[in-house]
């Protein structure tokens, strides 16, 4: 069964790159959610005036991977204890958030946060927000890492996250990688 998940954990280039490598994830689209204006641009979101988070919306086959496993990857590939910040990326657009699509996703998110919270030095600050609307990012942000692998941000920030995914979740990787 095809289901949707909408997750924010810093720069959407990172998040798209991670989840596009996970078996059972059918598609990953970078974009914006959680804000107050319609069809925001990257520039508007980055200046912090819209309230949107950079996020991804993915479609996944729930017969191959479940929402809990997606959240395991989510929490293992960013720091959910830093408020509105991931590394050098600072602002509400880089917050950690789960935009849940139904009550089951909410319950799963609450359960995994309760399980993982003791594993960090600081409390998890990931927001749980009912999903409302998702706006696709501009095309130049789609598949950014794969199209720009030698760009300094990709090498310094995204590549280490990919390595962490490979070492911590090898069994979840798509075979073609």
Report the location of each language-model feature.
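Flexible coil/turn and secondary-structure edge motifs
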Residues: 1-177
């Amino acid at each position: 069964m095809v289901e949707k998940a909408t997750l924010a954990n810093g720069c959407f280039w990172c998040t798209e790159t991670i989840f596009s490598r996970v078996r059972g994830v059918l598609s990953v689209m970078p974009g914006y959610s959680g804000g107050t204006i319609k069809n925001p641009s990257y520039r508007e979101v980055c200046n912090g005036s819209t309230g949107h988070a950079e996020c991804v919306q993915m479609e996944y086959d729930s017969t191959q991977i479940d929402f809990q496993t997606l959240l395991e990857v989510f929490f293992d590939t960013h720091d959910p204890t830093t408020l509105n910040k991931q590394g050098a990326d600072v602002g509400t657009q880089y917050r950690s958030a789960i935009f849940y699509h139904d009550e089951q996703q909410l319950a799963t998110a609450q359960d995994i946060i309760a399980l993982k919270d003791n594993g960090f030095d600081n409390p998890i600050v990931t927001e749980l927000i009912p999903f409302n609307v998702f706006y696709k990012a501009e095309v130049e942000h789609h598949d950014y890492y794969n199209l720009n692998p030698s760009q300094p941000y990709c090498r310094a920030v995204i590549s280490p996250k990919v390595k962490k995914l490979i070492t911590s979740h090898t069994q979840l990787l798509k075979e073609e990688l």
